[in-house]
Amino acid sequence: RSTYEQWLVQCPDFAATLRDCGALYINRKSVRGWGETTAGYSRVIKEGMEGIKAHIHKVLDTLDITRPGDYEKIEYLKAMELAADGISALGHRYAAEARKLAEAEPDEKRRKELLQIAGTCDQVPEKPARTFREAIQSMYIYQTCIFMEQNAASYNPGRMDQYLYPFYKADIEAGRLTEEEAQELLDCLWVKFSEQCLFQDQVTAQFSAGYPMFQNVCCGGVDERGMDAVNDVSYLILQATAEVQLYQPSLSVRYNMAKNPSSFLKKIAEVIKLGTGFPAFHNDEVGIEMLLNKGIPLKEAYNWNPCGCVETNLEGKQRCYTAYADFNLGSAVEFA
């Protein structure tokens, strides 16, 4: 009745024995979704579910159910549309709940906050984000839906400083947002990232208790032209990790010695010095070269991000997974 049951039937007896005694852990990808990807967050923020559904309909118009191979494509696209509707619906449910709470809220300041939340969730993720606040909300509702559907670790927001910066810049210039308010929003987002958890089977829960979600956020590096991509949001992201100091999100930096400023390196060092284990420090040029060696065009390779724990990844284009079985070396010594 499930993928897991199919996997159990095919699992050799010796492997099941080693798993049951704690010597080998092989359940992870059989009991949940795959993860290990950066799932098109920038597109969701820019287009909203409406834009994505419009693209689905455009492709559907080119297909013919009588043409070999098209039936499967049609069913797949209809499933995508259904998922998009579900993501939009969750946003509207949050909006309705915020309005309900606002009606019963005696504190005027909090009531206004709740109404602002309602207005934000009415807009996103169904429609394109218009502000920094809406962009963050759109991304996080989408993230929540991914976990609801997949129940897997390592769904990576990726290069947040790149896709959030245009909204931040526009809001700052229009006077809608201050740097302090933007920092608070990111700090709150960091807290929400740490709320995500998985539903585990007994073996997985015992073997990987405390296993984090590896939601890898990346900042720094270069843009699609190979130029310095560090911006104000890059520093705000580093500061969020410094201020919140929770185990999620996993923060990585791409540092390009030839392109990124020394002030960025100094900020990275200040955060590392706190002892939280973040950010992970990645040589940007090596990451680019790894993708070039896979045949990825240079313009696309410039946009790589560390994924999970950790693989080089391209947003919306790759799923990378480098470890399936975990071996307990201590048990090998004990058995010997």
Regions found by a protein language model. Name each.
Residues R1-A79, K109, E113-Q116, T120-A336:
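Conserved catalytic cores of very large enzyme subunits
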Residues K78-A89:
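Extended non-globular scaffold/tether segments
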Residues L90-E97, M160-Y163:
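Amphipathic, well-ordered alpha-helical segments in soluble domains
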Residues L101-K109:
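A conserved hydrophobic secondary-structure block that centers on an alpha-helix together
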